[in-house]
Amino acid sequence: MKKQRIVIKIGSSSLTNSKGSIDEEKINDHVRAIAALKKEGHEVIFISSGAVAAGFLQLGYPARPVTLKGKQAAAAVGQSLLMQTYIEHFADHDIKPAQILLTRNDFAKRERYRNAYATVMELIERGLVPIINENDSVSVEELTFGDNDMLSALVSGLIHADKLIILTDINGLYDSNPAEHPDARRFDYIPEITDELLGCAASAGSKVGTGGMKSKLLAAKTALSLGVNVFIGAGEGDDKLIQILKGNGDGTYIGQSDLSSVNNHRQWIAFHSPVSGKITVDEGAELAITENGGSLLPAGVTAISGDFPKGAVVEVYGPNGLAGKGQTLYSAAELEEVKGKRSDEFHHEEGIEVIHRNDWVSIKE
């Protein structure tokens, strides 16, 4: 089997018992499966939920807290308990785990985004298993990933993974809720995530987690757009992850074999960078940047909104609506001076492009 880079996301419901506390046997089962993958030569990045679930009972909460301060306090207690458990179980297989806690700002800030990539890659190259979780104890509610499903998709893109495996307590995607409809049919394979599928998916999470099936499909859609195929399902035993890679997993495979990876600069522009302004372009410019692989030139710019600096990321709108996002080579004030100007009106030593094609990402609304 070809050696692959695999991101594995395991949710709280697959790590805890009926009371919501850490289930040592479940964790041991997952660790053995990851160890089996490592033994085959695969690189593994582990997105683990469970910090809040591991900590809330320790704080005396009868159930998972719903307030931000309650969740953050539980995460502060639970994250260390969770990591200690992983360290002990991975030690049985001579594997060293490494903890990385991320916030949305770590992706939004360009330099921190690069640092996150460099750190994960260094750990992988040295044979460790990075265990990544959102830094729940300090995350601002408005600036979170939403749940670890989306975090796993963004991480899989960041490190150019070959596959994202999302393990859950449901063995794949069904055409209706199998708990309520015994005749529900499972999809063994779907090529893409459609709006119809998203509309059918239940959105509620479990009592010990935040991510329902809809969040997993949204994560899968994001991963596919970043060039990463996805598996959503369940599994038991030491070889469950190996069986998933072989195509024998108990769940749903999502995506096509010819997906193209997206470089990190474009990922940052598309999914993480703050938007500082808006540029409106004419039909010819819209066609050039969305269909013909061209750069945006001043001649096609018709309007500018926002006081953005050079190097900022802006949205670009054409006659058909949002065309995409790009990193501008002009400030708003500079662009006002040259908008509508033809290329032959520039001196040869001047830079012409408003947004270079390498700094552009098309977006379909």
Swiss-Prot record:
Catalytic activity: L-glutamate + ATP = L-glutamyl 5-phosphate + ADP
Signal peptide: none
Residues at which substrate binds: 49, 136, 148
Annotated ranges, domain PUA: 276-353
Any GO BP: L-proline biosynthetic process
Pathway named in the protein's UniProt entry: Amino-acid biosynthesis; L-proline biosynthesis; L-glutamate 5-semialdehyde from L-glutamate: step 1/2
GO molecular function annotation: ATP binding; glutamate 5-kinase activity; RNA binding
InterPro entries found in the cross-reference section: AceGlu_kinase-like_sf, Asp/Glu/Uridylate_kinase, G5K_ProB, Glu/AcGlu_kinase, Glu_5kinase, Glu_5kinase/COase_Synthase, Glutamate_5-kinase_CS, PUA
GO (cellular component) term, any one: cytosol
Subcellular location: Cytoplasm
Binding annotation for ATP: 9, 168-169, 210-216
Sorted UniProt keywords: Amino-acid biosynthesis, ATP-binding, Cytoplasm, Kinase, Nucleotide-binding, Proline biosynthesis, Transferase
Chief subcellular location: cytoplasm
Assigned EC number: 2.7.2.11
Family classification: Belongs to the glutamate 5-kinase family.
Protein role: Catalyzes the transfer of a phosphate group to glutamate to form L-glutamate 5-phosphate.
Protein name: Glutamate 5-kinase 1
